[in-house]
A protein has these predicted regions:
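HIT superfamily nucleotide-processing domains
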Residues: 1-369
Length: 369
């Protein structure tokens, strides 16, 4: 893998990743030496503290202006074919591209608003980095339609971005995710994901860290390794098993077709995965995406997130890297909505058993690649 870093006319950086025939791209300086700069003219987002829930939220009003469901010929993530109508990606072709989001929730190169001293209503600059990762120049592709090698290349890019963004002194957590389908709020259909380099550890991950730490202190074991051992022994909730990777519908699933994907070996982050583990993970992600699409015979919407250890310098050896998929469909023509009990009480209601949904996914093709 090689990288070529360029700067867009508005000041945002863009990184081309080359593999195979394009692997002759020149190497570039890591982001730790060249901190990313946000685009000029972008209003500075602000972090605001919720004293009731004791967690941060972000106010980024300029995101109201982001692109909303453009026609395919106006897609900003397709390669530039006509110099008179440039897209976000100037090159006419590419493998994978990562660049600063035009409408970021966190930024790193602006004059930030002053931090408030109000004990109740705390606020401070939303300092961080928001990137877009475009998986392929093919507007109609998906993780399921990409080759295993292409997904493997994507895993490599995720690991690289995790390492470089995590090395920035103001970043405490590198959060990788993909939103797929209008049912989960997608406004651009070109296959892509995003990365948020947070200045704090997000609440969902904080809770997982606390549980994993407590379990290790109590039992001497990794909580997630313990869960995987039980799932393999039982088998009813497994969706697929690879040499180095497992996928399951959790016993504690909140979404009907929720799937968690784990490396079998205890690793805490993407950069720690071996070459064989990265390839096996790519196979698992491609197979799972194919199962989702074949389940009801249409492109299956989902939210995919990567949970890995923080980059805050603390010892998080008790944690376990994994992917989580949250599809909103509960049947072919019905969606699960978050309503009163989920939003107001924080308790998820599941209209099906995880065992039943795992069986449906096991039986859906493909079974291997």
């Amino acid at each position: 893998m090689r990288k070529l870093r360029t700067v867009k006319p508005d000041g945002r950086y863009l990184i081309y990743y080359g593999f195979g025939e394009r692997a002759d791209l020149p190497a570039i300086s890591p982001l730790g030496e060249t901190p990313p700069q946000a685009a000029e003219g972008v209003p500075a987002p602000q972090m605001r503290w919720n004293p009731v829930l004791r967690q941060w939220g972000v106010v980024a009003s300029h995101r109201q202006e982001r692109t909303f469901l453009p026609a395919e010929e106006r897609c900003p993530f397709c390669p530039t074919r006509d110099p008179q109508r440039p897209t976000e990606i100037p090159a006419p072709d590419f493998d994978i591209v990562a660049f600063e989001n035009r409408f970021p929730s966190f930024v790193s190169g602006l004059s930030f608003p002053a931090e408030t001293e109000d004990e109740l209503y705390r606020a401070q600059p939303a300092r961080g980095v928001c990137e877009v990762v475009v998986y392929t120049p093919d507007h109609h592709a998906s993780v399921a339609s990409l080759s295993v090698q292409q997904v493997r290349n994507l895993v490599e890019v995720w690991a690289d971005r995790s390492q470089e963004l995590g090395a920035l002194e103001f970043v405490r957590y590198v959060f990788i995710f993909e939103n797929r389908g209008e049912a989960v709020g997608v406004t651009l259909h070109h296959p892509h994901g995003q990365i948020y380099a947070f200045p704090y550890v997000p609440p969902a991950v904080e809770r997982e860290l606390a549980s994993a730490r407590a379990h290790e202190e109590r039992t001497g074991r990794c909580l997630f390794c313990h869960i995987l051992e039980r799932e393999v022994a039982g088998g009813a909730r497994l969706v697929l098993e690879g040499r180095h990777t497992l996928a399951m519908v959790p016993f504690y699933a909140r979404w009907p077709y929720e799937v968690h994907v784990f490396p079998r070996r205890h690793v805490t982050s993407l950069p720690e995965l071996s070459e064989e583990e990265r390839m096996d993970l790519a196979r698992a992600l491609k197979v799972l995406a194919g199962k989702y699409d074949n389940l009801f015979g249409f492109p299956f919407p989902y939210v995919m997130v990567v949970h890995q250890r923080p980059t805050d310098g603390a010892d998080h050896g008790y944690y376990h890297l994994h992917f989580e998929f949250y599809p909103p469909h509960r049947t072919a023509d019905r969606l699960k909505y978050l309503a009163g009990v989920e939003l107001g009480a924080g308790t998820f209601l599941l209209d099906a058993t995880p065992e039943e949904k795992a069986r449906e996914l096991r039986e859906a093709p493909p079974h291997s690649v």
